[in-house]
Structure formats: C-alpha cells, structure tokens
Regions:
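Intrinsically disordered, low-complexity linkers and terminal tails enriched in Pro/Gly
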Residues: 1-7, 78-82, 158
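Hydrophobic alpha-helical bundle architecture
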Residues: 49-51, 55, 69, 81-88
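C-terminal helix-coil-helix/basic helical segment that borders enzyme active sites and/or dimer interfaces
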Residues: 70-81, 140-143
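Active-site metal-coordination segments of metallo-dependent hydrolases
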Residues: 78-94, 102
Length: 158
C-alpha cells in the first residue's frame, strides 16, 4: 500500500560537482569512442571518456580521474608496464574510486572492494600514499562549499 507522508529523503552528502572538479583538475571529458560494451570508461593524457551506458558513472568517473591524478596517463603509453604494472595501476585507480565514493556516500563502493580483494596482492606503501593524495585532490576539486573564504573545513585523511 501507499505510505503517506513517509517520503524517502536521501542522506545529505557533501556536495561534489563534477563540472567544477573537471575544470579545477584541468581534465577534459571527451566523447566515448569504444564500441566494446564491456568498457566503462578510459583516460588518456588529461582526458576522460565515460561510456554513456556505464552502470555506475560516478564510480567510473572517479576511477578514470584516478588514473590521471596517479600519473598513469603520462607514463608513456597507457599500456606500458615499465613504470607501474598495469594490474597495480587498476588497483590504484579503483582504490581512488572507493575512497571518493565512500566520502560522498555514492553507490558502487562494494564493487571497488570486491575488485581490490580479488586482486589479492599487497598494495605497496608508495601506492597507498599516492591513492590517498589523488582521492583527496579529486574530492577537494569538486567540493562545493557555501563559503569559499579559504578556510579548511574538511577532515584530514591520516
């Protein structure tokens, strides 16, 4: 039956604006060009493209921004394994997505967790530092605060 007056109100999330974030991070969004339905998104240089059919567009956005902020897209060609091994790159980017989703209370975090657990490797200390820094940068870049007077009101990630 109908429940009167019991309207679902989603919990307040710290406002994060995608357009603001992309501008602040100097990242351009381009049209998605891959016809393979399994690809959710990709990043090159300072560009991201998100599949219009992506199941979790926010998760995919954070993952691709993670690749850029972690420096993956500037390590010569993206598929080159000299610098950071490809599977570790994916884990780093997925970890960035996890932190961003959890901070903003957005769906998809459980998929990130499953992905990271399936990998089963140890995340090196240096990767962990890069991951926290990248997530923090992405969250700050899109943070919409009522007052932009330069005062810091965000929690620190230790």
């Amino acid at each position: 039956g109908q429940t009167d007056g019991a309207e679902y109100v989603p919990p307040a999330v710290p406002a994060w604006d995608r357009t603001t974030a992309l501008a602040a991070l100097d990242v351009t969004e381009t049209e998605f060009q891959i016809l393979n339905g399994n690809v959710q998104g990709y990043a090159r240089a300072r560009e991201i493209a998100i599949n219009p059919l992506a199941e979790l567009p926010a998760k995919t956005t954070f993952h691709e921004l993670g690749h850029i902020l972690l420096g993956h897209t500037t390590e010569t060609a993206f598929n080159d394994t000299e610098a950071t091994p490809r599977n570790l790159k994916e884990i780093e980017a997925e970890s960035v997505a996890l932190l961003c989703l959890e901070s903003l209370g957005l769906p998809g975090a459980e998929f990130c967790r499953g992905y990271i657990q399936n990998w089963g490797g140890e995340i090196p200390e240096r990767s962990a530092q890069k991951i926290f820094h990248a997530a923090d940068t992405i969250l700050k870049a899109g943070r919409v605060t009522e007052d932009r007077d330069g005062t810091e009101d965000r929690p620190d990630y230790d």
